[in-house]
C-alpha cells in the first residue's frame, strides 16, 4: 500500500493532530516543540530541526521551510520505491501574517494580502522544484483550503464565509475543467479516486463531484457550536440544547430567511452528523484488516 506522512510546520499536538494522524496510519513530520515524558504513538514522528528552519512565528515555520521538508521526504520515499500519500499543512495565511523578509513586495506582518502573496509565491517555488523531480510525472497534487479567512466563530454561520477553493492538479489524460457544484471537503477523495478510475469499497460520506447530479449537491457547514446542511437553497442549522433553525437561502444576496422547518430535512441533517459521530466513536470508520483497491486503466 501507500506510505502515509503528515507534514506540518508547527507542533502537531495542536488540535490533537498528533493523535489523529498517528492513529490513522500516518507518520508525522513536524516542529515538535512540546516533549512529553512518554509518547506512545503507533507510527513514527520526526522533528523539523533548527538548522532546517529559515523563519518561524508563533504558528509554525514558514511555508518555504515546509515545502523544502516535503521535497526531502518525497525524494526519500521515491528512492525506496514505495508509493506515497503525503498530507501537508501550511500556516502563513494566518495572523500575524509574518513571513521571510524580501520574498514579496508587501512587508511581513502588514496584512492578509501580503500573507496570501507570500503563500502564492511559495507555491510557485515549490512547483518549479517539484517539476524537475523524477517522481513528478506520476504524482497528483490536491490543493485545498481547510477554511477561509472569516469562517471562525461560535454563533452565526455565514454561508459565503465557508466557500473555499480546491484544485486537483497533474492528472493524466484530463483536460482542465472547472466544476461549479455545491460540495464539501469530504468529496475531494471520492472525486480524486474517480478521476484515477479506481474501483474501491469505502464507508466514507463523500461523493464523486464529477458524477454528482444536481439533486445530490449539498454542503456541510459548521463552527465551534453549530453544524448545518445546505441543500436546494435551504439551510438547516443544528444548535446547542437540541434546538435548530431552518432557512431559505438567497444565493445571490447571501441572505437567510427563517421559514417553517421541513421535518424530513431536519431528520436528514441529524442523521448525517449523528451517524458520522457514532461511527467515529465506535470505530466504524476504521479500515478493515483486508481492503482491496483495484486500479483500472
Which positions does each model-derived feature cover?
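Solvent-exposed soluble domains appended to multi-pass membrane proteins
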Residues: 1-297
Amino acid at each position: 500500500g501507500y506510505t502515509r506522512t503528515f507534514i506540518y510546520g508547527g507542533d502537531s499536538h495542536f488540535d490533537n493532530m498528533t493523535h489523529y494522524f498517528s492513529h490513522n496510519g500516518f507518520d508525522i513530520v513536524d516542529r515538535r516543540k512540546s516533549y512529553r515524558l512518554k509518547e506512545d504513538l503507533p507510527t513514527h514522528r520526526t522533528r523539523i530541526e533548527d538548522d532546517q528552519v529559515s523563519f518561524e512565528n508563533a504558528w509554525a515555520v514558514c511555508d518555504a521551510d515546509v515545502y523544502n521538508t516535503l521535497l526531502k521526504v518525497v525524494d526519500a520515499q521515491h528512492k525506496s520505491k514505495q508509493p506515497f500519500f503525503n498530507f501537508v499543512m501550511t500556516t502563513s495565511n494566518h495572523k500575524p501574517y509574518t513571513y521571510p523578509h524580501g520574498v514579496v513586495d508587501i512587508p511581513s506582518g502588514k496584512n492578509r494580502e501580503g500573507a496570501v502573496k507570500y503563500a502564492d509565491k511559495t507555491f510557485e517555488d515549490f512547483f518549479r522544484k517539484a517539476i524537475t523531480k523524477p517522481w513528478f510525472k506520476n504524482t497528483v497534487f490536491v490543493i485545498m483550503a481547510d477554511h477561509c479567512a472569516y469562517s471562525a466563530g461560535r454563533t452565526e454561520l455565514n454561508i459565503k464565509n465557508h466557500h473555499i477553493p480546491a484544485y486537483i492538479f497533474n492528472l493524466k489524460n484530463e483536460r482542465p475543467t472547472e466544476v461549479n457544484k455545491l460540495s464539501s471537503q469530504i468529496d475531494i477523495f471520492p472525486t480524486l479516486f474517480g478521476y484515477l478510475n479506481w474501483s474501491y469499497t469505502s464507508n466514507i460520506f463523500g461523493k464523486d463531484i464529477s458524477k454528482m447530479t444536481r439533486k445530490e449537491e449539498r454542503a456541510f457547514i459548521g463552527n465551534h457550536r453549530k453544524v448545518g446542511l445546505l441543500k436546494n437553497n435551504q439551510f438547516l442549522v443544528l444548535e446547542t440544547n437540541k434546538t435548530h433553525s431552518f432557512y431559505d437561502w438567497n444565493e445571490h444576496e447571501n441572505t437567510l430567511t427563517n421559514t417553517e422547518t421541513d421535518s424530513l430535512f431536519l431528520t436528514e441533517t441529524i442523521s448525517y452528523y449523528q451517524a458520522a459521530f457514532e461511527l467515529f466513536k465506535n470505530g466504524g470508520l476504521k479500515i478493515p484488516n483486508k481492503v482491496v483497491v483495484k486500479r483500472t486503466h
